[in-house]
Amino acid sequence: VGAELFIDSQLIARKLEQLHPTPSLFPAGDAGLQLAMVKWSDQFFRSALKIVLGAMADQWPEPFRKDREHLFPDIDFATVGVEAAHWRSQFRAHAWLLEQQLSDGRAWLAGAAPSLADIQAHPFVAMMRGAMPEAAGELLAGFTHLAAWEQRMLGMGEGTRTEIDIATAHAAARAAAPVKIAVDIDAHDAQRFTAGTQVVVEPDDTQRGGSVGELVVLQPNEVAIRRTDPRVGTVVVHFPRLGYRVRAAD
């Protein structure tokens, strides 16, 4: 959004809700619970991902495989298939949770209207249906409420997608007005960082490296840093606090 970058579904959902509050992503007023589901959906995704990797990674073109290995450095692509039965059981266990939630006849996971919960859950069911339809049929067997929900999700469509290349994205950030962010540091935060400290923000569940910048926001739900890069100029990058590690830069 201009010269601000929002990382992870948790923050993207909150920003979308702020910019476009109607229709709400949280129609039942349960934003905290639904945002917590983002972390659950990470585990659902992991089960689907490892099933697909174990069955198909050897068939991918080498450049694409290398790219995926860089994206998921904590997964050993050569051996992930050894535990295929375990990951299939995990996927089915996650899918059972959806079936259970829908078993009272509700149309959507949070009730009468679609919400962030549906957005968080559906992609991994669709991923399995698309990549491994025969396996998906077995893994989702007997989940009739989930199957009906899938059709409702598909009936909503996917909106209008606008493609943008990386050079255009960089140019948009450079051209955006400088971001004025009020310094907002939680006095009760256990790490006791102060505003202006050079920090690294990185996912706490992978080793993909982090982003370095000047700390401007540190709250229970968010950390934001200001950084300057020749490709994009000066930007403020926002991360969720949940699932991200903040440490002093070397």
Task: Describe each PLM feature range.
Residues 113, 124, 165-169, 204:
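Histidine- and/or cysteine-centered catalytic micro-motif in compact active-site loops
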Residues 25-33, 160-171:
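Short, flexible loop/turn segments with low-complexity composition
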Residues 1-70, 78, 193, 200-203, ...:
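GST-like domain detector, emphasizing the conserved glutathione-binding G-site
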Residues 162-195:
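Mixed-charge, Lys/Arg-rich low-complexity intrinsically disordered regions
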Residues 95-98, 173-178, 199-202:
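Short linear motifs at secondary-structure transitions and domain/linker junctions
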